[in-house]
């Protein structure tokens, strides 16, 4: 590590604490409370308290520390993490088409579950913090939901302005949060150090063996202690592997463990504190500041999830899983700071509906977990493929490591499945809707490409037929998704105007399996006959296409483009659903609606609107 990197490391680590660990860092607000006082409460006995604490501790060790920090964070896609980055990494190396198809569906479903999860996290986090007002005085109970709705509304309304300015406070606030978590827990452990016996895995094993039914019910809520663990991998591209690991081992994990064990120590002495063990750790004089700090921490956790949803939306668009949407860059300095209006308002409506419909954090906890455990299960399957295809691990070792992690994931997923009638149906339903949208768009675009390929003619035949066509001054650029053949917009233009520009460029944008593409590898320019050339522009799945910027790079290849002498011809497809094609009628209609409402190509590719000619074409699918 360079001296410059060493100097920057503390700042990066603090910034990572502010973004990466918000979700898992606010879990102490409700995790133990839900285990002992939720929809499937465990009796508050010393034996059960120690058994549950042991389960929580070893869940953090196995699912977060070993699985994500030690193993999955090694599977980065040029520094980027997350289910879609992992999907791109695996499909790039899967030679078997059927295997590649299965892996792709798994990755898409993981992304779909993430959308379901991202609706619940802001609702349960902020609501659980504001519920601390009830501890101060029960008279404030009626204000909890209005205050929560007000905070969430403010949070979603400021997204379009970006969070760069206030984002600088996220790290220090979360450092203070984790520091207080540790202090409150340590204070209570000092009164009852016997609680540390639960660090021994035998307590978890005995609890599971002697109270199998209770342990199974407990697992459904124990998972609340590890929700957000997947964010360590998802946010790796923003901060790097080492700062996240340093923050986890050096500060965040010890603070979480101390707080959970502090709550356990409190319950051993005062079982009646189970109504809100987290806030009962604080002295009476500190309750109001604690509610304020907890609310700030949950807002930061929610912001991280919202930003993650924007990032996944952009990845999905680039990977051909969603139609073009408006993507606004909210920072001139940071490429990753974006705002996706459709995603923002969809999440907002869902989050508000959840708060109003479920009414308290305990009810929401029943809905939480199923999406997270589903995502974790899929991540384990995908990383098993990475172990075989990329790391070339011995298959016996893969079976041992991945098999053990799969068993743990399946146990947690099964325990959460019993919560489906109580609220778990919501993230699953939202995940299913998202999965349907993602796969419908992917399938529809493939059918459109196939239909356009049928209607196209070979470039060689076209070039031979244009000798007598009148050529006019200037440059015409035709955007096309096909790497060969003649774009429909070019044929339509020639048919109606009977002329061609003296220079014609066919531009195809490709998305790679990597998060970014170096400018040296951005473009491929192929000169053909009679003033025609084909330009391939490559972008990573974390980048936003910029065609004028790509044309600037052509200077290095001897081609210059003057925007005032250049006309962009774009094809606007009108989709006509058909009963006779390879898609169910309702899905064809859904695809047609998505296609109609997609952001215009000129906006998405940053093409000057005063230089655009749009030509319509009708396609039957």
UniProtKB/Swiss-Prot annotation:
Q: Which UniProt keywords apply?
A: Cell inner membrane, Cell membrane, Ion transport, Membrane, Potassium, Potassium transport, Symport, Transmembrane, Transmembrane helix, Transport
Disulfide linkage: none
Q: Where in the cell is it found?
A: Cell inner membrane
Domain of life assignment: Bacteria
Q: Which InterPro entries match?
A: K+_transporter, K_trans_C, K_trans_N, Kup
Q: Example GO molecular function term?
A: symporter activity
Q: How does it sit in the membrane?
A: Multi-pass membrane protein
Annotated signal sequence range: none
What are the transmembrane regions? 12-32, 52-72, 101-121, 138-158, 166-186, 213-233, 249-269, 286-306, 338-358, 370-390, 396-416, 420-440
State the reactions this protein catalyses: K(+)(in) + H(+)(in) = K(+)(out) + H(+)(out)
Gene Ontology cellular component list? plasma membrane
In UniProt terms, what function does this protein have? Transport of potassium into the cell. Likely operates as a K(+):H(+) symporter.
Similarity comment? Belongs to the HAK/KUP transporter (TC 2.A.72) family.
Q: What's the protein name?
A: Probable potassium transport system protein Kup 2
Q: State the organism of origin.
A: Dechloromonas aromatica (strain RCB)
From the UniProt record, report the name of the gene that encodes this protein.
Answer: kup2
